[in-house]
Amino acid sequence: MEDWSARQYLKFEDERTRPSRDLLARVPLDAPGLIVDLGCGPGNSTALLAERFPQAEIAGVDSSPDMLRRARERLPECKFVTADIGAWSPQPETELLFANAVMQWLPEHPAVLRRLLAALPQGGVLAVQMADNTSDPALALQREVAAEGPWANNPEVRGAARDDLLPPEFYYDLLKPLCARLDVWHIVYNHVLAGPEAIVEWFKGSSLQPYLRPLDAGGREKFLAAYRDKIAAAYKQRFDGKVLLRFPRLFIVAVR
């Protein structure tokens, strides 16, 4: 499990794409020439950008070979590049940097956000969405399982938890000195999923991956079984058997 799985991620494509739509709706540009989709994944967010800005040159950047393979199949007219976003820099003429659900994975993301915004020309836009759910049960239970099982002394497993985001005020003070306009807001989604098992499947495509990668096949199954039991106890099934997955997300749109 050294790579992110596009197939697993896309099991919930509609739900995962919804924040991209909400972020894109707040981008105040009419006809940008060059757009870069940072952390483009399998191209679902890139497709939205291509639909809204059909005349633009659009590139996607990601570190996952499997995600990029799927993105290239989906959008052969776009350019996709393998790169570490933490070290990547935009071309001077880039007018929109679109980063949906990627920056939260970078512990140094505040410095990365500030550097990317500073690299944009006047009027350029940095649009960011980050998962802000580390205190919600689904992620708290991942940390519980990591601390309780036979893998508890494995430093890779114990260190797999994502850092909390900082308060909105922090991002405002960080970025406002560099831009003419800054908008920061939260949206809390309540995704209707088929049942507790669907929650496990959701996070197998994202935040469970760093916990599972260091384990062998048997360890992964045991980890998932323990997590599955905790999720079933924490998320009550509604009258129709479905569950609601609460998912808060932080949005930032900065105009240089």
Describe the residue ranges of each PLM region:
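Short conserved AdoMet
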Residues: 28, 54, 72, 76, ...
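Class I SAM-dependent methyltransferase SAM/SAH-binding core
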Residues: 34-90, 111
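A short acidic, Gly/Pro-enriched loop at the edge of an enzyme's catalytic core
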Residues: 89-97
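Short catalytic micro-motifs in class I SAM-dependent methyltransferases
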Residues: 101-102
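Conserved catalytic/acceptor-binding region of the Class I
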Residues: 110, 117, 121-194
